[in-house]
């Protein structure tokens, strides 16, 4: 195999089961606010006191300060999204845009890590690293992806029994660009865990974003990340157990291939976004960039929490007035359905 050594039957089964588990936990967390509170607040609190001090220890790969910080930062992101979805007090302009900012910061932090590994060849934090120009290329891909984050002031809370954090301007091409970059990053930095914490983890949020609840990729991503970190801290041996581990080939050609693909795709996304901003004269700080895209319109109309006969009017006002049609003068969520 090009990217990985041949998988054993038990490894194939564990990969598939872990994917189903992550998607299932994400869907479970969407049922209502109490289930979300148990998964992202109560359970981690119990594990922090009684379990993780004994499992996330030195020599397990989960005992570093970085893993502890990463775990609680992922949980904080999931909790913030949960608060925004279920509590109107948090549905404010400058709170709703915090998750996208965190998204960008996390991308840029990973890019720095990619750059740092450029000249490294050997074991780093327990993983084989094969550094090279591909690290630089993928770091640039990540920077382009972060620059292309848009529509963060247009995030809405969906209607219906299941409440979701919906980001209509986060369309499929940005998602694929992010997935390619992130997989290349994990493959470059933690190669023998990249199947689980890269490919499987990304599939666990991309599949729901395309086939279960469109427009909620950011929510799916942060929740599956949080669940993954809970698993990592609780049973850190799982990902590197001989029966389940998926070894990278550590082939420089494989590193180069995925990094080139990530860079090329994100460069195309960047060019298309620049065309949209300058060619269509759209200001990303005042309006949605892709509001004329069929994907945007579908997500917005199926999610906006207004009566059915007012949804087209709300979309038309958002298109004409930009974010002025999405927030009131105090920065609270507002959907303009009547023209001023």
Residue ranges: model-predicted function:
Residues 1-18, 134-138, 252-259:
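Hydrophobic transmembrane alpha-helical segments in integral membrane proteins
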Residues 2-89:
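An N-terminal, globular interaction/scaffold subdomain
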Residues 59-64, 122-135, 246-258:
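Membrane-interface segments at the starts/ends of alpha-helical transmembrane spans
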Residues 87, 112, 116-119, 154-161, ...:
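Juxtamembrane transmembrane-helix termini
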């Amino acid at each position: 195999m090009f990217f990985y050594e041949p998988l054993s039957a038990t490894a194939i089964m564990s990969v598939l089961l872990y994917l189903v588990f992550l998607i299932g936990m994400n869907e479970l967390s969407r049922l209502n606010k109490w289930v979300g509170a148990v998964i992202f607040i109560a359970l981690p609190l119990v594990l922090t006191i009684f379990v993780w001090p004994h499992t996330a220890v030195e020599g397990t790969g989960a005992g570093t300060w970085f893993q502890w910080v990463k775990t609680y930062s992922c949980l904080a992101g999931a909790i913030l999204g949960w608060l925004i979805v279920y509590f109107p007090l948090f549905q404010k302009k400058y709170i709703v845009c915090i998750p996208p900012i965190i998204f960008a910061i996390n991308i840029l932090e990973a890019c720095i890590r990619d750059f740092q590994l450029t000249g490294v060849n050997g074991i780093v934090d327990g993983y084989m690293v094969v550094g090279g120009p591909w690290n630089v290329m993928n770091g640039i891909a990540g920077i382009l992806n972060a620059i292309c984050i848009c529509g963060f002031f247009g995030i809405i809370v969906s209607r219906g029994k299941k409440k979701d954090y919906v980001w209509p301007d986060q369309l499929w091409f940005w998602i694929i660009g992010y997935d390619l970059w992130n997989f290349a990053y994990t493959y470059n930095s933690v190669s023998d865990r990249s199947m689980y914490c890269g490919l499987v983890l990304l599939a666990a949020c991309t599949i729901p974003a395309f086939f279960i609840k469109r427009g909620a990729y950011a929510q799916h991503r942060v929740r599956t990340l949080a669940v993954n970190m809970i698993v990592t801290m609780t049973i850190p041996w799982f990902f590197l157990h001989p029966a389940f581990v998926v070894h990278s080939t550590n082939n420089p050609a494989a590193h180069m291939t995925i990094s080139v693909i990530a860079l090329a795709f994100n460069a195309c996304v960047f060019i298309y976004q620049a065309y949209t901003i300058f060619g269509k004269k759209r200001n990303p700080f005042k309006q949605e960039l892709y509001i004329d895209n069929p994907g945007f319109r579908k997500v917005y109309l199926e999610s906006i929490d207004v009566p059915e006969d007012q949804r087209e009017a709300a979309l038309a006002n958002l298109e004409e007035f930009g974010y002025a049609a999405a927030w009131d003068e105090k920065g609270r969520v507002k959907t303009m359905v009547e023209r001023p």
